[in-house]
Amino acid sequence: ATPGSAAQSVADEMVRAGLLHLDLITYGLEPNGTLIPTIGDYTAIGSESAPIIQFMDSMGWHDTARRAIGFFLDKQHDDGFMQNFNGYMLETGAVLWTMGEHYRYTHDDAWLRDVKPRMLKACRYLQAWRARNQNGAKGDGFGLLDGKTADPDDPFRSFMLNGYAYLGLSRVAEMLAASDPAEAKLWRDEADALKRDLRESFIRGVERAPVVPLGDGSWAPAPAPWTGYRGPVMLHADGGAWFTHGTMTGRDSLLGPLYLVFQ
């Protein structure tokens, strides 16, 4: 074998081994029961289970992915909210995104008809949440969702939380475009409005952010992970206690504006 083909073989084996590892920690009753796509030694989370389920779909395990999505729909709250772990507030948008990716792979219209009522209930929950925060001047969090996105108790209008919400609403509009154009337009308009509010808040954050040096000698503004704070929280520009999980950089590197790439 050539060096290139050997490397490709190793990569292929690693990918397939990863899939089997995830299969080992996905629990449920065969042949058709709901599956729980756990995160190692703790339960499924809409955000952290999303790449697991989407990886399964990308490898052709569409039935497994569908049953794993079912976990979040089975446990959905009566008001449409989805939450399974440690008070995390971002699962609803992340699950809607994963549903959209599943539909992109499968175009399973029978499944879409089955999940549509619960999917729309989740959308209406996000819509009402957004409406509660449409107060004050545009920018600095207007119309954005507020709540914690990970282990730290940060109940702010974060870009991670809202990036997932936008992506979820956008995927719902995409899924319904052919079968229910009127409903699709409603959620496309809602997603686009959230995107505009997100961009205005992000630009406001960039305007007030300090600049930091880059590797090529240039400087760039470094915004905060949420609205209303000046720059990366690890710089303590506006004070606060930000040490968590053995690092000062966790919030800025893992929970911040990088999720706006979804737009």
Where are these regions (language model features)?
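Non-membrane alpha-helical structural segments and their capping/turn regions in soluble enzymes
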Residues: 12, 62, 66, 109, ...
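Long, well-ordered core segments of solenoidal/helical folds
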Residues: 18-30, 60-81, 115-137, 190-209, ...
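Solvent-exposed, non-transmembrane amphipathic alpha-helical segments
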Residues: 38, 72, 76, 85, ...
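General N-terminal targeting signals
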Residues: 52, 69, 73, 99, ...
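Catalytic cores of carbohydrate-active enzymes
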Residues: 131-138, 142-146, 154-157, 164-263
